[in-house]
Structure formats: structure tokens, C-alpha cells
Amino acid sequence: MLRPLRKSVLASCRHCFKVCGGLPQKQLPLFSPLLLRARYSSTDSSTKRSNKSDKIDAPGFKKIFLVAIIGTVIFVKTVQSLDKNKPKTTLSEEEFENVVKGLKRRVAIFPQGEVDIKFSLSPSIEETRKVLQKSQGDDINELQFVDPVKVIDYYRTLRDDRYEALLNEYYKKYGCDTYAYNLPTGMLVMLLGRYFKENFKAGDKLVVVNFPHSIADATRFENEVSIVSKIFVPRKLSGSDVCKYYETVGKADII
């Protein structure tokens, strides 16, 4: 009895399998809303991730601009530093005037009494020597004469001197006889002081001829180089401002 029952059950199962196997299976359409939503969601997420990644990886414009400015500032400062460290071998007229304005010498090159310096308004060493020979005799043998024009010529022709180029400009403009007295304010006295410092010593007796041409040069010389003990003035120049200036302090000697 059990055998026929088992056969019946097996037959029923086979029948059900055939029926179920034969039914068409339900499939999602190719463009179903669910599928589109899934795809859009996936693409949108990917785009957001990409944008976020770009924002993180790419430097901002402000940062680039700031870096460029900092780099420029560093470059400029470096160039300026190199320019400052570079030795300057020449000076223009404007630069020299700025140097003179900023120069505040506390003491003269030679303290008062260390050297004996006299001025002469005679135009040359020869004329000054001739006049002094009559009045002082052999005493002039101890004197050393200085012609400012020759001093300026010395520095004008001194190779690679910082004032060589500027002095040559004035030489071409004014000529050999007068250019020394047309230099920028203070330059003649400055170069005279430099020459005195390089060539003379304590105890020397000096006469500077054809100098000064103005009270300003006279006072500048005494402030920067040394106090003058006397000035020799030809009679024809006794009415000049320079002569009157030194007469007030009892240093003018009319010759």
C-alpha cells in the first residue's frame, strides 16, 4: 500500500515542477525607474566625489597669488642686498651732493695748531712765492705750496678713482683753468682735505694759493680740514668779501 502512495506523491511533484518551470519569469524592463534611479544615484555620487577631490587637490587662486607676491618680494630684497654689497666705484653729481648733505664731520682732519696753513689770493704758486720772498726772505723755504687746480687734476687723472668720471665731465664742460672752481658745492674742499690727509703731517707749513673764492669755501675748509693762521691778499683784492671776512678776525695780510 505504501508503494502506490509513494509513486503518487512523486508524480505530483514532477507535475508541479513542469508547471512552474513552464511559466514565464517576471523581468525588469531595461529602462525601468528603479534602474534609472540607481544609475543616476551612482553617477551623482561619483560626480560629487570628483568635485570634492578637485577642491582638495587643486590649490586656490588666492594661495597661488600670495605665493607669487611673496616670491617677488624675496627676489627684490635679494637684488637690493646684492646692490648694497656691491662696491660702488663712481659717484654722480647728485649722489655726491647727497653725501655732502649727510656728512657731519665732528672734528677737522688736523686739529688747530697741528699744521700751519695759510691762504693766498694770488692766482699762482709763482706769484705767491715771489711776493713772500720779498717780505719773508729765506723763511719761505720751509713752506709747501698747494694749488687746488693741480690737486683736482691729480684726482681727475687717478685711474679708477671714484671721482674720476665726474671730474672729467666738469673738465670737458668748463675747461682746464676754471673747472675746479665750478664743481658741486663742497667737492673742492673735500678733495683738498683728502689730499692734505694723504700727503702732509703734523708740523708742516702749507700755503694754499688762489683759494678761497668765497666765504662759504673758507668756513667749510676750516670746519673740515684745519684752522687757517693767515691769508695773503693782493692789494687789488683788499675789498673782496673774503678779505673783509678775515680782517674781522685779524688774519688778513695785504701784500
From Swiss-Prot:
One of its GO terms (cellular component) is mitochondrial membrane. Residues 1-40 form a transit peptide. Keywords: Membrane, Mitochondrion, Transit peptide, Transmembrane, Transmembrane helix. The keyword Nucleotidyltransferase does not apply. The chain crosses the membrane at residues 64-82. It is a single-pass membrane protein. It is found in: Mitochondrion membrane. Belongs to the AIM36 family. This is Altered inheritance of mitochondria protein 36, mitochondrial. It comes from Saccharomyces cerevisiae (strain YJM789) (Baker's yeast). The lineage of its organism: Eukaryota, Fungi, Dikarya, Ascomycota, Saccharomycotina. The gene is AIM36.
